[in-house]
Each structure stands twice: as structure tokens, then as C-alpha cells.
């Protein structure tokens, strides 16, 4: 034992040095690991600086539109009908009632209802679509097949496919009275289909076989339209995207053979990318459903569930009558909220046009609205703005030079002295737009 102790005592200095060396290595490794962990945390999860950057980015980009906030010097883009005006409504109590949580296991199958003609249509969405039309009274839904599409654009394409004869000797002519919706020509001819082709202004068409697209109220000018052509070999598709009480008087329940609607212009949820069709003929509905099946193997069930929840919140909002003496409370009544917005915006736009003196707008179109049970004017979601100033033959370019982006009349089959302006952007963007317009002379 003494020998062992003598041995340990004799080598104590070397042992301590070795132990210290090992501790130094361990400490160095630990420090490097800590430094690496800190770097990785900053790199992938963000530190204080990264958090500050994220907060700054969140402050600079609007949460729902992805567009930066506008300033007095901003370019105001009113080319698209981006319905961000509705965000204020959905930030309130109605938005909470429209919130939906989709569990990870839900909506995994392709199929919604295998026994249905439109097997990818969620039953809940069909139910809420029918409820909404009964509430508003803008279309007959009973006795019609309900189809769902990725926006009404896909349903428009499905209708063209369904209405074109198989193996035609020449493509079916597709027409619409000018000014027509600017996407009709582009979408019709995009795939260069042998089944159908764009044939222009319905008022100039001289033929017997055709599909006439009837957009009413009209995009771009808000006018009420009926089919122009009456040939027995022709058929009309009615695009009723804007036939809602915030935009126009609901004078009767439409009952056409094919009627197209879209969530975006009804509720403001353009990003949900959903539309629906009411189709009277079963064979046509089957062909339209087949087109969507082959085109996209159905329609997002997640979007359908969300849309169903949104439509339910709208209809339920009218089941809850405002408290006594609170008739101006529109927090649950979407159409009343949007109507007030449109009335206010059109009044400001007409005042700006009058102040400028170089622009004109279509006359107001009043009518008895069965939904509101009173006579009201139309307040379309787009303004058809014409310029009478000498030398301004390209109004789109004239406005662009003044940092206002619009859509020129040529895209609608009209002349260059007129443009389409969206009335549905944010309050801030709209306010800057009317201020600039009023200053032009």
C-alpha cells in the first residue's frame, strides 16, 4: 500500500497536468458546440436581430394581401378586382364565426360524395350555397345541379367544353356583347382548342351556332345584360358573379340554364379560389363535372370547407336580427356592410370626377331590390371611367404616368379613352386614388 502511495505521490504533477489537459479539451469542445448551437439557432430560428427583421417585414406587408401599405407616393394598382375592402368586415365577430380548423386526418380522400353527380363537391358547401341563394333571392337553386370549380373561370371553361359538339367540323363560336369581360377572349383561346374559339362582339356576330357569354351586371361597366342572340342553335351562359345586393338591385331570382358565381366577389375571399355553377340540364352538368375531373381531379376540399363556413356565417348573420335601436350595426350582415362601403365610395368617386371636369362615369341605375325591399341604385365593383380631355387617346397610359394602374378599354372590346377601375381595394388605396383623380384637369 505504501509503495502504491509512493508511486502516486511521485507521479502527482504529471497526473494533474494530464487531467487539466483533458478538462481543457472538454471545455473547448463544449464551447465550440455551444457556439455552433448559437449559430444554428440564429441561422434557422432567428435571434433578436432576426426577430426584429421579421417584425419589420410583418409591419411592412399587409397580412392578407401580401401588398405593402400604400403611401401618398405609392403606385395605386386598381387593375385587378382584388377585394381587400372586405377585410375590415371579416376582422370582426363574423370572422371569428367563419374560422375553421381542419384536423390533419380530414379531407384526405379525393372523394366527397361518391353517389353525387359532382362527386368532389362537399355536401356542406352545396347546402350553404342553396341557403345563401334562398336568403338573397338572386337565383333559383331548387331543381338545379350545383357544381364547384376552382374559381368561376374553371367553370366557364367547363361550360364551353360541355356545350361544344364532339368532333365538330369547325370550332364552336364564343361571343359576348362589348364591352365584355377582358378574360373571356384570353381564356377561350388560351389552349387553342379545336372545340371552340373566340368570335368577338355578340352584337356583330352573324351565325347560327354559338355560345354567348352574358355577364350581368356587366364587368366592366355594371350594366344589366340579357342575351343578344336568339338563334335556336345557340346557347347562353350567364356569368352572375356580381349579382349580389351590395352591387346591384336584386330584381328577381335568375333561372337561366347555366349560371356562374364566385366566392371572391360575393364574400371577398378571392384567395380561396372557389366558384360554383347552377346547371339545369343533367347531361350538361355531367360533362362539366367530367371536365373538372380531367382538368384538376376535383376541387380542393380544404377550400370548400372554408367556403362553406364563410357562407354559413353570412346566412347566419341575417338570422340574428340587430338589437333594438341598433339597425346600423352591420357587424354580422355582410351585404349591408358592403353596400354602405360601395355607396360611400361611389359618392367620393363621382365627387372627384366632378372636381376634375375631364372624366365621365355611367349614369346610376336604380331599381327595386327584393332583398332590401326598397328602391336602390347600382354601385358596381368596377368603375367604367371615360376621359374627354383633348389629346388623351390612351387613358390607361395617361393614368399610369400618374401612378394609377388601370385596365384599358381595348381589352374589353372598347376604345382607348376608357378604362376599368377596381372599386374594391383598401380604404387607403381608394382614398389616394380619388384624391389624385380630383386633381387631374
UniProtKB/Swiss-Prot annotation:
The lineage of its organism: Eukaryota, Viridiplantae, Streptophyta, Embryophyta, Tracheophyta. Gene3D superfamilies: Aspartate Aminotransferase, domain 1 (3.90.1150.10), EGF-like, alliinase (2.10.25.30), Type I PLP-dependent aspartate aminotransferase-like (Major domain) (3.40.640.10). The modification N6-(pyridoxal phosphate)lysine is found at residue 265. One of its GO terms (molecular function) is L-tryptophan:2-oxoglutarate aminotransferase activity. The keyword Metal-binding does not apply. Its EC number is 2.6.1.27. Highly expressed in anthers. Expressed at low levels in ovaries. The keyword Ubl conjugation does not apply. This is Tryptophan aminotransferase-related protein 1. One of its GO terms (biological process) is auxin biosynthetic process. Keywords: Aminotransferase, Auxin biosynthesis, Pyridoxal phosphate, Transferase. It comes from the Eukaryota. InterPro entries: Alliinase_C (IPR006948), Alliinase_N_sf (IPR037029), Ethylene_sulfur-biosynth (IPR050478), PyrdxlP-dep_Trfase (IPR015424), PyrdxlP-dep_Trfase_major (IPR015421), PyrdxlP-dep_Trfase_small (IPR015422). The gene is TAR1. Pyridoxal 5'-phosphate binds at residues 110, 152-153, 219, 239-242, 262-265, 273. It catalyses: L-tryptophan + 2-oxoglutarate = indole-3-pyruvate + L-glutamate. Its cofactor is pyridoxal 5'-phosphate. Pathway: Plant hormone metabolism; auxin biosynthesis. Probable tryptophan aminotransferase that may be involved in the regulation of auxin production in developing rice grains.
